[in-house]
């Protein structure tokens, strides 16, 4: 439980860092006079290394151990976040965002492999559901913390990053001192119970890499990652533009500062993602994972279409529903991936997967910016994202047939 909690807290933080730029992009854009296109590229500056770096981080985790990579990610992110206090021109900010993405990229291959290696298939979805809930809370906390800080100190996005740096450093110390995994490559190589049939049943040693199902899953997460990146980067802006919090302001009898209102609305929407992850983790069983993953992708389509024409408070409702169904895919996907990977290669497998999901997903923000600048609304961009989600929903379906794949939970029967 302690291991799951520590790793899940590191997961919450990585998504807080990932979503940090979207939470303050309007303030940064105002300071440096960025256009919407330039703001989209600012998101890409963080998301591209965040995705591509995951593959190389997976190689390092397989070589040096997951715990060392987690500690490096936390202390590196702390250093870069604190460096924003001395940020100068716009080119420096792009460089700092790139560096932050590099260190943040280290989390998923190390953290997910650690959890996959410490759990059995039948309990993995529930553990990853908890892991996903904290990740969603991390995403939601980014705009919430930004909104709170910008309410108290308007325009102070640097102080926001200083706070994130302090949180990163503190968690780095806790992981360094308290995280006690079974050991890299354990238990089938290092356990004193090596050779015990029960251990072999839990940790099969002859599970082979299966390229066909892995490729289908990775293509699906690349498409879903584009949807994720495109919606999240401009979510505070999308919700702010329509007065989505007007009913809440009327109920409270007070106005929310203009610099914070989009962030508070985005935080409310993204909290719904945590409930989606929890529900998916609770309902998932090894035999239902492909079907549920396909459904989670497919449910993005009507939500995104609703978001294209929703106005006022309905934008917030549409965004809440989208977040709920979109984030359901994460515990399902992360439970399926290790079933097609040998245990000693799960870090690099998750690394490549996240490279595709977040790396290809880095085109999402400039894609949305391109269409919105040209057509002055979200109709074309969100409709295009809905099309990508539909294609993603088709890809897990072949995994339902044992004629095409041999899954870990079949192997252990």
Region roles according to the model:
Residues 345-374:
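A late C-terminal transmembrane helix in Major Facilitator Superfamily
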Residues 131-183:
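Helix-loop-helix hairpin linking two adjacent transmembrane segments in secondary transporters
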Residues 21-22, 213-270:
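Extracytoplasmic gate region of multi-pass secondary transporters
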Residues 96-135:
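Cytoplasmic helix-loop-helix junction between adjacent transmembrane helices
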Residues 288-333:
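C-terminal transmembrane helical hairpin of 12-TM major facilitator-type secondary transporters
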Residues 91-99, 314-321:
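Paired small-residue
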Residues 52-88:
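Conserved MFS/SLC helix-loop-helix module at the cytosolic interface between two early adjacent transmembrane helices
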Residues 19, 47-55, 140, 270-278, ...:
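Residue-level signature of mid-helix packing/kink "hotspots" within the transmembrane helices
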């Amino acid at each position: 439980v302690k291991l799951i909690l520590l790793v899940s807290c590191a997961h919450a933080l990585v998504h807080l860092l990932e979503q940090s730029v979207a939470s303050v992009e309007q303030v940064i854009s105002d300071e440096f006079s960025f256009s919407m296109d330039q703001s989209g590229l600012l998101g890409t500056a963080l998301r591209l290394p965040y995705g591509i770096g995951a593959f190389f981080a997976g190689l390092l985790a397989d070589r040096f151990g997951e715990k060392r990579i987690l500690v490096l990610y936390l202390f590196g992110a702390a250093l870069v976040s604190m460096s924003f206090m001395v940020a100068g021109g716009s080119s420096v900010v792009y460089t700092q965002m790139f560096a932050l993405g590099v260190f943040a990229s280290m989390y998923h291959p190390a953290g997910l492999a650690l959890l996959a290696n410490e759990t059995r298939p039948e309990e993995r979805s529930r553990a990853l559901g908890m892991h996903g809930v904290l990740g969603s809370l991390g995403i939601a906390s980014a705009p919430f913390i930004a909104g709170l800080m910008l309410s108290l100190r308007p325009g102070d996005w640097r102080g926001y990053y200083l706070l994130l740096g302090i949180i990163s450093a503190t968690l780095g110390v806790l992981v360094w001192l308290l995280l006690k995994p079974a050991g890299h490559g354990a238990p089938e190589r290092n356990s004193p119970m090596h050779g015990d049939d029960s251990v072999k049943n839990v940790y099969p040693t002859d599970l082979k890499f299966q390229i066909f199902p892995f490729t289908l899953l990775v293509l699906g997460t690349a498409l879903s990652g584009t949807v994720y990146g495109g919606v999240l980067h401009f979510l505070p802006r999308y919700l702010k533009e329509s007065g989505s919090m007007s009913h809440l302001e009327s109920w409270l009898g007070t106005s929310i500062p203009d610099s914070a209102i989009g962030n508070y609305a985005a935080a409310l929407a993204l909290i719904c993602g945590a409930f989606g992850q929890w529900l998916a983790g609770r309902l998932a069983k090894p035999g239902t994972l492909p079907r549920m993953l396909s459904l989670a992708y497919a449910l993005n389509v009507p939500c995104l279409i609703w978001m294209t024409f929703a106005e006022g408070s309905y934008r917030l409702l549409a965004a809440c529903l989208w977040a709920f169904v979109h984030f359901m895919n994460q515990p399902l996907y992360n439970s399926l991936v290790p079933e097609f990977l040998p245990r000693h290669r799960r870090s690099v497998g998750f690394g490549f997967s996240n490279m595709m999901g977040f790396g290809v997903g880095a085109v999402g923000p400039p894609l949305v910016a391109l269409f919105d600048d040209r057509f002055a609304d979200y109709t074309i961009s969100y409709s295009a994202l809905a099309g990508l989600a539909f294609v993603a929903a088709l890809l897990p379906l072949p995994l339902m047939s044992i004629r095409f794949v041999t899954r870990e939970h079949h192997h252990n029967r």
